A protein has these predicted regions:
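Charged, glycine-rich active-site and insertion segments that engage polyanionic ligands
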Residues: 1-82, 86, 90-160
Length: 160
């Protein structure tokens, strides 16, 4: 229903409406904020971030933290929300509940590959770390410090 509303009433293209609907999780107000914000490529940003974390490429994580710091608060929140949603999708994939997955296309391909290296314990720990980072961001902590700290902790979690 929300996706149809965004397409019909707001004139948003189908692929973008699907992404917004997935992020908003039924919250119309949040979906409208996402629709009004500039198009950002959370999927690509997340994929690059997780690859750097998995490879423990700490040198590339510093510029990523600087880029994250340069985003506005809504974009930072959107990336964290997106990251948490991908962890959820990965958990569903590992659990065999693929009929509940909302991902499509390249995002689904990444989740299929990502689920091969993730375990329930890694997802639980990553989810907790991301929620903690989101909490600190909401309390106006330094986005660069929070993102870099989260990245290092995720690198240790994903590839111990």
């Amino acid at each position: 229903e929300l996706e149809a509303f965004l397409i019909n009433q707001r004139g948003i293209e189908v692929a973008r409406a699907a992404k917004i609907t997935s992020l908003a999780e039924g919250n119309v107000n949040y979906a409208l904020k996402l629709a009004e914000s500039d198009e950002d490529d959370n999927a690509q940003r997340f994929i690059e971030w997780m690859r750097a974390c998995f490879k423990k490429n700490y040198i590339s994580l510093v510029p990523m933290a600087e880029d994250y710091h340069a985003l506005d608060k809504l974009q930072q929140k959107n990336l964290m929300t997106y990251s948490i949603n991908v962890m959820r999708e990965t958990l569903l994939r590992i659990s065999g509940a693929t009929d509940m997955n909302r991902s499509r296309g390249d995002e689904l391909k990444f989740i299929q590959d990502f689920s091969k290296v993730m375990t329930l314990e890694k997802i639980e720990k990553s989810f907790t770390l991301m929620n903690d980072a989101n909490y600190h961001l909401e309390r106006n902590g330094s986005a660069k410090m929070i993102f870099l700290d989260l990245s290092i902790k995720l690198a240790r979690t994903i590839n111990p």
